Amino acid sequence: MRHVLSLVYKCSVFSKQVTVFSNHLRLSHSQQWGSNKLHRKIKIPNPFREIIMADPKIEEILAPLRANVKEQGDLVRKLKEEKAPEIDIKKAVAELKTRKKILEDKELSLAPAEDLFDRAKMEDLIKRRFFYDQSFAIYGGITGQFDFGPMGCALKSNMIHLWKKFFILQEQMLEVECSILTPEPVLKASGHVERFADLMTKDIKTGECFRLDHLIKGHLEKIKSDKNTKIELKAEIEDILIKLDGMNADEMSALMKRFEMKSPISGNDLTPPIEFNLMFNTQIGPSGLVKGFLRPETAQGIFVNFKRLLEFNQGRLPFAAAQIGNSFRNEISPRSGLLRVREFTMCEIEHFCDVKEHPKFESVKNTQSLLYSADNQEQGKPADLTTIGDAVCKGIVNNETLGYFMARIHMYMLAVGIDPKRLRFRQHMGNEMAHYACDCWDAECLSSYGWIECVGCADRSAYDLTQHTKATGIRLAAEKKLPAPKQIEVVEAIANNGRIGKAFKKDSQAINDTLATLDNAALEEMQKELDSNGEYTLITARGEFKLTPSLVNVKKTQKTIHVEEIIPSVIEPSFGVGRILYCILEHNFRMREGDEQRTYFSLPPTVAPMKCVVLPLSGNAEFQPFVRDLSQELITVDVSHKVDDSSGSIGRRYARTDELGVPYAVTVDFDTIKEPHTVTLRERDSMRQVRLPMADVPTVVRDLSNSKILWSDVEQKYPKFEQQETVKGTSV
């Protein structure tokens, strides 16, 4: 971990010197609907806000725009405090987004640009070396589905292995593997059946579907880019695009009619907007009677197993459960490679706790991160570089447990190769919060596609356990020992089981289970209804049933308790492996200075697909025993590697392994044959080499790959390699 800690330290020191310019990346050209965007270079803005702030003339231009955003942000807060009508709040939020976008665009236009990023070259390298490619390509491919090749699989596997060490091992989490097929009642209770949907429209003749917001955006951007479009209309379109995310079905439908939108593929008319649930539905079993879905997240499997996990943990809180697996979302129009797909791997943690202090918070409180709070977004301010400890102390981050996991996420992202200058945490604003969350921060990475959400860290409170308790009648709760016994008033439903059994037969169990879950408020409401109306309608998982005083009554008693029942809160870090993997590749894509055709990935050794390559200098038969011995010794110490004894110059073979992101290369040459047997070890990024005893190679490469030592340590210990002393058995 030495390399990782060094990187974190360097990031922390470096970050103190700059304030990062946190804007939403905007591509240099509009993305045309359905166009091939591969063959173009993309201008990535300089992420440093310090450059802008240092120029008073630039800040003078931005000051009134910041004031406009702050003014509107204050109005939004005021409307919320006054509990104004929802429509008024929505309009105010839409206007706030408009002003934010104007400010961000102006900041972006004033910021100096970094070098052009050649996405085409990177994607060519990814495809040519088979990191990943479109699934079923020989049949034309399926949009939003990808197959990982040998290098992609190894990179992904190493990322997950490091994730397990960072979280499961370090925090002693309970790992589970739950079913992908999920019965409908589970996802009804969680809210996914009702709320997990996007608006779409269809080609009335071909039936081809389009995600509505993407269709509108593509159509309007095409009009906007037309040189014949009037300035007034361009300005109006810009305003519409900014407000698009907050529009409902009626507003989008009006835009379709006004701009006479047709299918971008066929030119045919389109249907009115319809809601499309993003979950893949299926039938479980041959009868077709059991409806199910492919899970949209791995979390629900953990929640429904809460009682078993709590029991495994001897009934104690806090504890965390983790799961790694695939989830599925039937995206209407997947795009942007691995960033929006229909099948993806997630690493999710559910941390169950009753108090939100964390025992390890002290160890991470000085971690510096770039935080883009909801308040800063509303005020038109940039993200702040601050410590997690200060953020929790000031109430920017809700609690210690949430802050602890944000710090650990930050460290993990740096360890796998994310550029610290292009990493931030952005807090969800109230209008974009998921239905289950009371606070949420996304770890976002800046890429050529913009700021990409890669990790969500949500405070789900007790939402999920409460919902599943209501749906099943089974208490998903923990017991907490009280420091001293206390007297409480207990309100409970006393059921006449005999009469309920005769009256409702097979439904009697569902009735009794539901009665057991009613809280005091519901029981008091029941008593009120029974007294005034002579009956009470009980809603259960099997339907509604009318109960009378002869079947049930409500009783209040005094009771001494030694423990209290609590439904724990949940902090959920959720990692999108594919998105992180893509950002790692983009952040580590390099071109050799002076030779742009020599591209490679500067991946950290910890996650590199292979740790080293063994290369004989030529096809000389004398090299083969040494190559075999080296390979076997590397296998013995668990170092993944390959032997490249193909024809071609040593330089060409170095370049080939650099493309794969292999950090080290061991070369067997004529000096190896002599005693003592030595080889050269080459480092990928610097291309520098040292000469070391052949027997040292396995241990050195293993320790480099595990970040126990750095390349600088190796250079200090072993002599620099200039040239071999022997050529075909003759000393130079």
From Swiss-Prot:
Its EC number is 6.1.1.14, 2.7.7.-. GO terms for cellular component: axon; mitochondrion. Gene3D superfamilies: 3.30.40.230, 3.30.720.200, Anticodon-binding domain (3.40.50.800), Bira Bifunctional Protein, Domain 2 (3.30.930.10), S15/NS1, RNA-binding (1.10.287.10). Disulfide bonds: none annotated. Keywords: Aminoacyl-tRNA synthetase, ATP-binding, Cell projection, Cytoplasm, Ligase, Mitochondrion, Nucleotide-binding, Protein biosynthesis, Transferase, Transit peptide. SUPFAM superfamilies: Class II aaRS ABD-related, Class II aaRS and biotin synthetases, S15/NS1 RNA-binding domain. Residues 61-117 form the WHEP-TRS domain. InterPro entries: aa-tRNA-synt_IIb (IPR002314), aa-tRNA-synth_II (IPR006195), aa-tRNA-synth_II/BPL/LPL (IPR045864), Anticodon-bd (IPR004154), Anticodon-bd_dom_sf (IPR036621), Gly-tRNA_synthase/POLG2 (IPR027031), GlyRS-like_core (IPR033731), tRNA-synt_gly (IPR002315). GO terms for biological process: diadenosine tetraphosphate biosynthetic process; mitochondrial glycyl-tRNA aminoacylation. Glycine binds at E297, E348, E572, P573, S574. The keyword Oxidoreductase does not apply. It catalyses: tRNA(Gly) + glycine + ATP = glycyl-tRNA(Gly) + AMP + diphosphate; 2 ATP + H(+) = P(1),P(4)-bis(5'-adenosyl) tetraphosphate + diphosphate. ATP binds at R329, N330, E331, R340, V341, E453, C454, R579. The keyword Nucleotide-binding applies. Pfam families: HGTP_anticodon, tRNA-synt_2b, WHEP-TRS. It comes from the Eukaryota. Residues 1-27 form a transit peptide. One of its GO terms (molecular function) is protein dimerization activity. Homodimer. Belongs to the class-II aminoacyl-tRNA synthetase family. Catalyzes the ATP-dependent ligation of glycine to the 3'-end of its cognate tRNA, via the formation of an aminoacyl-adenylate intermediate (Gly-AMP). Also produces diadenosine tetraphosphate (Ap4A), a universal pleiotropic signaling molecule needed for cell regulation pathways, by direct condensation of 2 ATPs. Thereby, may play a special role in Ap4A homeostasis. Required for terminal arborization of both dendrites and axons during development. This is Glycine--tRNA ligase. It comes from Bombyx mori (Silk moth).
